[in-house]
Design a protein with these regions (language model features):
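Extended, structured polyanion-binding interfaces
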Residues: 1-147
Length: 147
């Protein structure tokens, strides 16, 4: 059976979305950032809504809603200029085998050369655990979400 491109998830739908993304790449050039956002089942917004004995697997509606809201906030930060002047993006949301959503996002920024500079990247990317004595609340949160 051949399904039309208007049916979400069909082969023609995927091909259409792929062609749209390629057209954007042709117009905008190479993307500047590739961001992956993964849902964390320990987010307080999720755990606060679960009843005693429930896990995130029991409430995929809550997990999806919280993830979508956090993704919307991330997009608002990019579009608002938190990471430089925004020019465009393409994203895809998938569900892992564990049932948790994650998004793959490519961004184009208006200043095409800014993201080639180490200083620009270092301003927004941090890969260190906060100091336990001077930034205790950040340390606790990072340690809690890591394990």
């Amino acid at each position: 059976m051949i399904l039309p491109g208007s049916v979400t998830g069909s082969d023609r739908w995927y091909k259409s979305k792929y062609m749209d993304a390629m057209a954007i790449c042709c117009r905008m050039g190479r993307p500047h950032l590739f961001v992956t956002m993964t849902c964390n089942p320990k987010w307080p917004e999720i755990t606060a809504q679960l009843k005693k004995g429930q896990t995130h697997n029991d409430r995929p509606d809550i997990v999806s809603r919280v993830f979508k809201q956090k993704l919307a906030e991330l997009m608002k930060d990019f579009k608002g200029g938190q990471f430089g002047e925004y020019a465009g993006h393409v994203h895809s949301i998938e569900f892992q085998k564990s049932g948790l959503p994650h998004a793959h996002i490519i961004f184009w920024m208006a200043d095409k050369d800014a993201w080639r500079k180490t200083e620009t990247v270092d301003k927004v990317i941090s890969a260190e655990i906060p100091d336990e004595s001077s930034r205790r609340s950040y340390y606790i949160y990072v340690a809690w979400t890591m394990w």
